[in-house]
Structures are given as C-alpha cells and as structure tokens.
C-alpha cells in the first residue's frame, strides 16, 4: 500500500510496536525510476527520460503479513531521514547482543605432546 511519508512513518511505528514481543520488520530502500515501469519503449528512450527525472527513493516495509511503502523525493530526503531515525530510536530498544563464542584454549603443540605421550605408553 503506497502511503505519503508521514503516514508511512506512523504505520512503520505501528508495525514495530506489533512485532515488539515476537516478530521481525524488514525495511528496504532502493532508487525509484518511473520510466522503468514502461517496458514497451526502447531502452534508449527510457534512459533519456530517466536522466531528466528527479531522484526518488522507494522505501518498503513488511512484517510478513502487512506491506507498506512510500516514495521519498530528493527534496524531502533530510526530513524523512530525521523522522525515520526517531522511529528507529524509539522502537529498537530491545536488540539482542550476540555473545562471541569462546576460542579453544588448547594449542596445537599441547595436543601433539599428548599424542606422543600416549604412543610412548603403548610401546
């Protein structure tokens, strides 16, 4: 569902809140080009038109069931980024810190001495 920027951010906030206990929200951003949607034209014509267009960013978010999206214009980019950052700071407070796996303390030289000691006892 295509929303305007403010409605998208409020819907994104609701998505994060509904999945706060259990679930995941995926957010993707990519360059949006209007002329790519019309494939019947020749490629050269589409490239010429895309050079004249204003840069836009397509932002999508989903929790697996509900999908939302918006198109951010270049002139609105800084305001959208500030508001998006605020939504993230509010909702990403329960991130898990992954523990590093401990490295083995045995060195290769100690394991080889154990093998040679075992061989000596067999003989």
UniProtKB/Swiss-Prot annotation:
Map out region (Disordered) in residue numbers: 99-123
Q: Which UniProt keywords apply?
A: Cytoplasm, Ribonucleoprotein, RNA-binding, Signal recognition particle
UniProt GO BP: protein targeting to ER; SRP-dependent cotranslational protein targeting to membrane
Chain's role: Component of the signal recognition particle (SRP) complex, a ribonucleoprotein complex that mediates the cotranslational targeting of secretory and membrane proteins to the endoplasmic reticulum (ER). Srp9 together with srp14 and the Alu portion of the SRP RNA, constitutes the elongation arrest domain of SRP. The complex of srp9 and srp14 is required for SRP RNA binding.
Q: What subcellular compartments does it reside in?
A: Cytoplasm
Major site of localization recorded for this protein: cytoplasm
Q: Where is the composition biased (Low complexity)?
A: 103-116
Note the Pfam families from the entry. SRP14 (PF02290)
- In terms of superkingdom, the source organism counts as Eukaryota
Which Gene Ontology cellular-component terms appear in the entry?
A: signal recognition particle, endoplasmic reticulum targeting
Quaternary data: Heterodimer with srp9; binds RNA as heterodimer. Component of a signal recognition particle (SRP) complex that consists of a 7SL RNA molecule and six protein subunits: srp72, srp68, srp54, srp19, srp14 and srp9.
Query: Per UniProt, what is the name of the gene that codes for the protein in this document?
Result: srp14-1
Q: Which InterPro entries match?
A: Signal_recog_particle_SRP14 (IPR003210), Signal_recog_particle_SRP9/14 (IPR009018)
The upper taxonomy is:
Eukaryota, Amoebozoa, Evosea, Eumycetozoa, Dictyostelia
Q: What is this protein called?
A: Signal recognition particle 14 kDa protein
* The family this protein is said to belong to: Belongs to the SRP14 family.
- What GO molecular functions are on record for this protein? 7S RNA binding; endoplasmic reticulum signal peptide binding
By its UniProt entry, which Gene3D superfamilies does this protein fall under? Signal recognition particle alu RNA binding heterodimer, srp9/1
